[in-house]
Structure formats: C-alpha cells, structure tokens
Amino acid sequence: VLSPADKTNVKAAWGKVGAHAGDYGAEALERMFLSFPTTKTYFPHFDLSHGSAZVKGHGKKVAKALTBAVZHLDDMPNALSALSBLHAHKLRVBPVBFKLLNHCLLVTLAABFPSZFTPAVHASVDKFLASVSTVLTSKYR
C-alpha cells in the first residue's frame, strides 16, 4: 500500500518524466531486452534494435499505462483492468517479466534523473511499480 508520501514521490517523479514518458518507456524496454534476452520472446515480429519504431511505440504504451496508474493511484485495479486482462489471457506474459521491466524502469529513471531520484523516491517508485505488477498479474489465477 502506498503511503501519502509515496504517492507524492511517485507523482513528482512521473511529473519529471512528463511529455517524454514514451522515450523513457522505450529506453527501459531496450534495457530489458539487452539485460534479459528471454523477454524478447513476446516480440518476435518487432525490430528490437536501438531506436526502432516498434520499441518506441511499445514504450509509449508502457508509459501510457503507467501514467494511467499514476493518475489513479487509489484505484489502479479498475484503471488497469483491461490491460490486466490482455496480459493474463491473450499475451500470457510471465509475471516475472514485469519485475524485470520494473527493474529496468528504475535504472532508467535513476540514470536520467540522478539528483531527483533520491533513496526515498526510489523506494516509492519501486513500491508503485510493484503495485502495478500485482494488478497486472491479478487475473492470472
């Protein structure tokens, strides 16, 4: 459960990402594909090279989902319900892969916002991403 301080930190951190959220989403995906090659299996039809249009496009989708979650911190299950259905029933993404992407998102934010990404912000964003993962995997059962 996110505390009021966590919610403030998450909103502030995501506010820094702002209009470039898709770029950061793509950067995190690239990190994930490089660091955890097994995650590429969900994207056999994508050009996964650096800067590809497909990775950028999916980065925008990831960023939009996270923006929706930030805007609905008190009701993420409803805000992400359709996305949860998609990942559980159609795409069948391994729940572990959400944790891998979360790690890459944290690294991306830390690398791009070193002075703003304090230990407290890191902890809050980590809790937020874990909450998003829990919601996205809730329909796997």
Swiss-Prot record:
UniProt keywords, alphabetically: Heme, Iron, Metal-binding, Oxygen transport, Transport
Superkingdom field: Eukaryota
A Gene Ontology molecular function term for this protein is:
heme binding
Give an example GO biological process. cellular oxidant detoxification
Organs and tissues of expression: Red blood cells.
All copies of the Globin domain together span 1-141
Which residues does O2 bind? 58
Question: Per the record's keyword annotation, is Repressor included, yes or no?
Answer: no
Q: Which Pfam families match?
A: Globin (PF00042)
GO-annotated cellular components: haptoglobin-hemoglobin complex; hemoglobin complex
* Binding residue positions for heme b: 87
Q: Please report which protein family the annotation says this sequence is part of.
A: Belongs to the globin family.
Q: What else is known?
A: Two kinds of alpha-3 chains were found in one gorilla. An Asx replaces one Ser (at position 131, 133, or 138) in the tryptic peptide comprising residues 128-139.
Q: How does it assemble?
A: Heterotetramer of two alpha chains and two beta chains.
Q: Explain the purpose of this protein.
A: Involved in oxygen transport from the lung to the various peripheral tissues.
Q: What is this protein called?
A: Hemoglobin subunit alpha-3
**Organism field:** Gorilla gorilla gorilla
